[in-house]
Amino acid sequence: MARQHEILGMNARNFLFQGRYNRLRSKRIADSKLLTKQVLKQAKLATPKLYKQFKTESKVDQFDLTKLPDSFVVKPSQGLGGEGILVVDKRDDDGWLAVDGRRLTTQDLRLHILDILAGRYSMLDLPDRAFIEERVRVHPRFEAIACQGTPDVGVLVFNQVPVMAFLRLPTKESHGKANMFQGAIACGIDIASGVTTSAVRYTDEIKFFPETRRKLAGITIPRWDEVLELAVKAAEASGLGYCRVDVALQPRTTKTGKLKSTPMVLEINAQPGLKIQLANKAGLLSRLKRVEGLKVKTVKQGIEIGKQLFSVREEAESIEGGVIRVGIFEDIEVVDIFGDRHPLKAKLDTGAFRTSIDEVLAKKLGLMDPENILWERHYHSALGREERRVVGITFYLKGKKTKTAASVTDRSKLKRPMIVGRRDLLGFSIRVKESEAGQEA
């Protein structure tokens, strides 16, 4: 569970991140779903197809609702918390059926749209715009763990880095809405793998979907890398430095019968809630501080930083496979930029947080390639102000593969060109051999 000093509170969110990194123009984009759609379309990012939008009552009266597809969604442009969203499942005689089983006539739909225009669901209690868009179906991966509505994935993006994510599952209690305050379930997601780790309902941890024995941990999110890429690009397109991007997977079957899915942005939230921390059992503040100020040059780099920094390495999983005994000095294999392994001797140092590698060796292995440099940090030492790069690295220790981030340093005067820090030693038990006791690094 997260420590108190790692948790992000509302005041810190508003002052340190939302207020500092979100410009007013960008907030206005996020506050309007229609404006968000326009910006995403210009950036060529996927979002549900827009069928019709309404600005005035006369436009509602003039439009022939019977020309709509069998299934669609009616939304307010500036709604809050899922209020005012009406999901139509299919046609029924001379009307439609909503996902909650209600029968809807043409007049029912018109009245609902007019309520939206009157500002009934507006976050500002002001007249709003209504629109009708493509309905995103439930992906087969989630059919057994969702009720009535479509699950979505919320990715919190800061400084072009995905720092935390959750899967929201509608329930019977939430009436098909992915709203945690109404009873929807939130599952924390490991950024590195796209696999759910734990789940909460309101503030209580749960292990199974209600009224079933379906486990909520261990669910793999389809097309995870594409979801992350879409989220980071959407945040970039909106101009928001700190936001949550909600993504849904639109499933479809190809002519050959294969299942394909397309990640689509549902909306962008410039003031994301804080319950994502409960779902992940982790604090946002510590994660945000780790990426604040980093110079992220590309979307790919931002995603790689998020994966390296915030991967979940469950201790239980390590113990299941048995604790691996090692000494202070061990032979390891480091993978170069082409995927080939190179043997070398390394020191296992629990006193160091991060793994580090000699600069000359890193260059030789191709790890200093610009595409592989995760970020650069400046720090002060006895020699003055110095720059240190952090690169992506993969190595094998006692047959166990570890993909991590390593600091690049000058170790030319030391015996071993690499140190493995405690961050990458989970599942290992270090035993000091008598012959190692007096040796230097």
Where in this protein do the model-derived segments appear?
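C-terminal active-site "lid" helix and adjoining low-complexity regulatory extension at the edge
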Residues: 218, 222, 249-322
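A short, polar/proline- and glycine-enriched secondary-structure boundary/capping micro-motif
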Residues: 173-182, 275-280, 366-369, 414-418
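Pepsin/retropepsin-fold aspartyl endopeptidases
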Residues: 290-441
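Short, surface-exposed charged micro-motifs
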Residues: 154, 246-248, 345
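A long amphipathic alpha-helix within ATP-dependent nucleotide-binding catalytic cores
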Residues: 119-147, 175-253
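A short acidic-Thr-Gly-centered motif at the start of a beta-strand
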Residues: 62-67, 237, 250, 254, ...
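Short, His- and charge-rich active-site/binding loops that engage polyanionic ligands
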Residues: 75, 85-109, 158-205
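Active-site nucleotide/adenylate-binding loops and adjacent lid/helix of ATP-dependent enzymes
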Residues: 8-22, 26-152, 159, 351
